[in-house]
């Protein structure tokens, strides 16, 4: 599970340590990488490269095997005071054979950054399906964006994970309600928000 420093994370002392790195000097970029592996039988995989320069984060995500012609929400998940992990099927607490976003959250954590194509990138845009990339007709997403990350995220980037969402579970070529409603927003189908892949973020060379 998400390696939370449960007692310490809420204490002033440990929180100060976690955010003491916030004053990162500009001009000294560091490269991070995430290998995205499939969840929920999606077959979706990919790579993410993140270049951090202070709080500026330039991200490239190249994925394949996603549901064609459908939007795919994608985020940095996690907490500065924790180490994110990608869930296994053991996270399926309701035994329906799927890991929904809520079931995965104890492993990878809450939304920290929304990788939208334009506009806001905060957690408030976590379900802005009209601003997330749409996969090509062959199920690829090639995403590039430079944004300003929250200081706590930028300073502790290696504690976080990237998750892409959206799986056509019944294979009809679109997101529908055949698998029920989203656990995040009942106005959306579960297919639109269920995790498709996940990868922990690591500094290049580690």
Task: Please describe what each predicted stretch is.
Residues 12-20:
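Short hydrophobic alpha-helical membrane-anchoring segments
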């Amino acid at each position: 599970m998400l390696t939370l420093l449960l007692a310490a994370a809420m204490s002033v002392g440990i929180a100060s340590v976690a955010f003491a790195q916030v004053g990162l000097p500009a001009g000294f970029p560091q490269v991070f990488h995430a290998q995205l592996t499939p969840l929920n039988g999606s077959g979706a995989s990919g790579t993410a490269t993140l270049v951090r320069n202070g709080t500026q984060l330039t991200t490239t995500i190249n994925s394949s095997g996603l549901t064609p012609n459908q939007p795919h929400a994608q985020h940095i998940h996690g907490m500065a005071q924790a180490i994110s992990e990608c869930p296994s099927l053991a996270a399926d607490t309701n035994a329906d054979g799927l890991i929904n976003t809520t079931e995965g959250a104890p492993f990878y954590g809450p939304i920290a950054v929304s990788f939208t194509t334009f506009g806001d990138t905060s957690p408030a845009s976590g379900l802005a399906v009209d601003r997330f990339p749409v996969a090509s007709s062959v199920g690829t997403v090639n995403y590039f964006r430079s944004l300003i990350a929250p200081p706590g995220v930028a300073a502790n980037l290696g504690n976080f994970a990237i998750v892409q969402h959206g799986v056509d579970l019944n294979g009809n070529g679109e997101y529908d309600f055949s698998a029920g409603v989203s656990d995040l927003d009942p106005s959306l189908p579960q297919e639109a928000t269920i995790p498709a892949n996940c990868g922990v973020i690591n500094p290049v060379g580690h």
